[in-house]
Amino acid sequence: MDYCNKKHTAEEYVKISDNNYVPFPEAFSDGGITWQLLHSSPETSSWTAIFNCPAGSSFASHIHAGPGEYFLTKGKMEVRGGEQEGGSTAYAPSYGFESSGALHGKTFFPVESQFYMTFLGPLNFIDDNGKVIASIGWAEAQGAWLATKNEAA
């Protein structure tokens, strides 16, 4: 039976300290956020990255087309305006789950922070009117990472 002879996807190991963080695209962030793409998976439409977020930095408004999970390893992250505006505030160390369709206005980091996140499906960045301006899935994340990594080399 041919379906049993599918090619096995190779395992991966990434030693984070062996790679340089590169700037996350400024069109989707503010304040100098850097990142490393750790894995992209066409077979599951997922991508995993680690982000360094300086104090005062933020991600632009976006919608999670698919669910995502994060682990805040350092700092503080205010989602949907933080607790003071009815959203969530994560304090390290913290785990979070983002459901499909979750709408986030600016995600803000009031102190130096770092988090690891796996996205299942694309992240849709939106303008002030809620119109999607960019959809970042595994292929786009991989392309941005490779382009920026090659520029930095």
Swiss-Prot record:
Bridged cysteine pairs (disulfide): none
Broad class of enzyme this protein falls into: oxidoreductase
Reactions the enzyme catalyzes: acetylacetone + O2 = methylglyoxal + acetate + H(+)
Entry cofactors: Fe cation
UniProt xrefs under SUPFAM superfamilies: RmlC-like cupins (SSF51182)
Cofactor: binding details: Binds 1 Fe cation per subunit.
UniProt keyword terms in alphabetical order: Dioxygenase, Iron, Metal-binding, Oxidoreductase
UniProt xrefs under InterPro entries: ChrR-like_cupin_dom (IPR025979), RmlC-like_jellyroll (IPR014710), RmlC_Cupin_sf (IPR011051)
Enzyme Commission number(s) of this protein: 1.13.11.50
Involved pathway(s): Xenobiotic degradation; acetylacetone degradation
Keyword Iron carried by entry: yes
Functional summary from the UniProt entry: Cleaves acetylacetone to equimolar amounts of methylglyoxal and acetate, consuming one equivalent of molecular oxygen.
UniProt-recorded name of the protein: Acetylacetone-cleaving enzyme
Natural source organism: Acinetobacter johnsonii
